[in-house]
Amino acid sequence: MTTRGQKADILVKVLGTAQDGGIPQIGCYCKNCQRARQDPQFLRLRPSLAILDLNETKMFIVDASPDISLQYDLVHERMERARNHKKNVPDGILLTHAHIGHYTGLMFYGYEALSADKLPVYCSKRMGEFLANNGPWSQLVKYQNISIHLLEPGTDITLTPGVSVTSFRVPHRDEYSDTLGFVIAGQKKRVLYIPDIQSWKAWDRDIREEVESVDFALLDGTFYSPEEFPGRDLSRIGHPFISTSMETLRPTAKKGKTKIYFTHLNHSNLALDPGGDAIKHITNEGFGLAQEGMELSL
């Protein structure tokens, strides 16, 4: 983490922490959505990160959400200062998968809006094929607003001399593409980013080992517990509950080496109640909720 007055040259900045529907969610008037409508501090944007290398004046976006215009404002001050007021186009975008909260912001880089020029988009082979062969995304490729760069899971890519990223596959609903997670490495520290996964048991890796190998972990926290789904078939939920993840990762959290935050929060999530038992439990167990604007120094 960074605090006011600290100097950090390589950062991961959290730009969005909600599930794909955002908070408030369209057409929903639950207490969490109503609270967000009445008080902007409870608004949450769709899932996204920025990777900032201030030494190289480079900025990369992880997942182009439909809130990308607002999310640019969260990096504007740092990057405008670093870039000498140049046009604030990212140096690349990395995509996890083809669900609406994670890639549809690409449309704003097209002819009708920012009109980017060969903006590198890093993604899996299947994701790249989806973009190239389906409109309106194929127009971005045709007009060379974006340039697709395929990621090979398990292989590092170098974004700047001080930043590298390793992608890996995770199990998830893969209607149009497969799903990736990322390890983002700076010169000193590393971040694990898994906003979507079917379950930790369904993965062919040990989540405890993966978390303990990094300094920060931003993990799928879509739902807090089965209480959000009375009468529902829990096998169809498709995300690990925060309560389950905390039970799995409690020994890791107690060690204190890795800071663990939950992100990708659904509007129904019990942890969104600032005075509720869920957020108290999360905090008392040594975990946290990711917040827009939060910076992780690498």
Annotate the PLM regions.
Residues T3-E77, R81-N84, I148-E210, M294-L298:
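Core dinuclear metal-dependent hydrolase active-site scaffold
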Residues I61-S65, V89-H102, Y122-S124, L192-Q198, ...:
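Active-site neighborhood of phospho(di)ester-bond hydrolases with catalytic His/Asp-centered motifs
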Residues R190, Q198-E295:
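Cap/insert and terminal regions of metallo-dependent hydrolase folds
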Residues N55-I61, S65-Y122, D215:
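Active-site metal-binding motif and surrounding structural segment of the metallo-beta-lactamase
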Residues A8, D117, V141-S147, T160-V163, ...:
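A short helix-to-beta-strand connector/capping loop
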Residues R126-P136:
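A short, active-site helix/loop in glycosyltransferases that binds the activated sugar's phosphate group
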Residues P24, Q71-D73, T104-L106, A132-N133, ...:
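Short glycine-/acidic-enriched loop or helix-start segments at secondary-structure transitions
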Residues N88, G101, D117, Q144, ...:
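Structured loop/turn residues at beta-strand edges in well-structured enzyme cores
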